[in-house]
C-alpha cells in the first residue's frame, strides 16, 4: 500500500471523526466485513492490498469510513492504484465522496491526465459531477486534448454534456473567445502575453486553422515550432519543418499551399515528401501546383514507389489518379516488392484505379514474370 500527495491537516482535524464510533464497534464491523469478503475470496484483501479504509468505502459504511479516515490512509492506494475516493466514485456513493473530498481525498495521478470528475462522468452521475466540478481540481485538457465536455460527449452522457455546455458557455477564456470570433490580432496578442493552450488540443487546432486561413507567417512558424518540440529541426526552413508534421487534425495540404506561393522549386527529397502529403490528402490542386513547380511525380521512394503507387495505396479519387497516370512515363513500373500500379490496385481492391489503369493499357505483372517467360521458351 502506497500513499501520495498526503494532505497536511492540523491534528485536531481528524479527531472528531475518530471519536464518531466506539472502538469495539469499529473492530467488530471490520471483522464482519473481512469475513464476508473472505467467504467469496480468502486472498482478496491481501492480493488487492486493501486498507481498512478501502474496505469500509467498498462496503458503503459511511460511519465506519468517518471513524477510520486519517491523514495516513486518506490517499493510500490499493494494488490497482485506487484510492478510497476512487472506490467511492466507482461505487456511486455520493455521500462518501463528499466526505473524502472534504478530508483532502484525491485519486492517484495517471498517465491520461484524468481526475476524479472523469470517473464520475464514466459512471454517469450528474449530481456527483456537479459536486466535483465545484470542489476539486482538474486539468482543462487530458493527455489526448479532450475537455470534460468532450469526454462526456464521447461517453454518451447527455445530461452531463448539457451541464458542461452551460458551464463552458459562461467560463470561456479570452483566448477561446478570440479564436471563436476569428480575431487573429487578439489571438496573437494573448499568446504573446502568455495565454496557455495545448498545441494538440481542440483549441490548438483551431488556432492553427485560423493562422493558416489568415496566412499569418509569424503565427504559423510559432505553431509549427511548438508542434515539433523535441525534434531536431536545426536550420531547416519552415516548409521543411512542415514536411515532418504528421497530424490529421492540421490541414497540412492548405498550409503547404500557403507556404509554396513564393517557392521557385524544391530539392527532390522535400518535393517528394510534400507530394506524398498532397496525395494522401487527395488534393489534386496541390499535386498540380507541386508538379508545375518541378516536383517529379515519378520520383521513387525507398520502397521504389512512385506517386501513382501512393495514390492507389491511399485510394484517392478518380481525378487525381487520372492526373498521375497521364504524368507517369511508365505506368507498369514495379516497386521493390514486385507490384506494378495495376497489381497494387487489385490487391488493395481499388476499383477506380483498376478501371483507369486498364483503360490506359496497363498490365499486371510481377518481378519474375519475364524470367518465367524466358524459361518457358527454353522448355523449363
Swiss-Prot record:
Entries under InterPro entries matching the protein: Ankyrin_rpt, Ankyrin_rpt-contain_sf, Multifunctional_ANK_Repeat
Family annotation (Pfam families): Ank_2
Highest rank taxon of the organism: Bacteria
Membrane-crossing residue ranges in chain numbering: none
Key words of the record: ANK repeat, Repeat
ANK repeat coordinates: 48-76, 80-109, 112-143, 170-199, 203-233, 239-268, 270-299, 303-333, 337-366
Record's protein name: Putative ankyrin repeat protein RF_1306
Native source species: Rickettsia felis (strain ATCC VR-1525 / URRWXCal2)
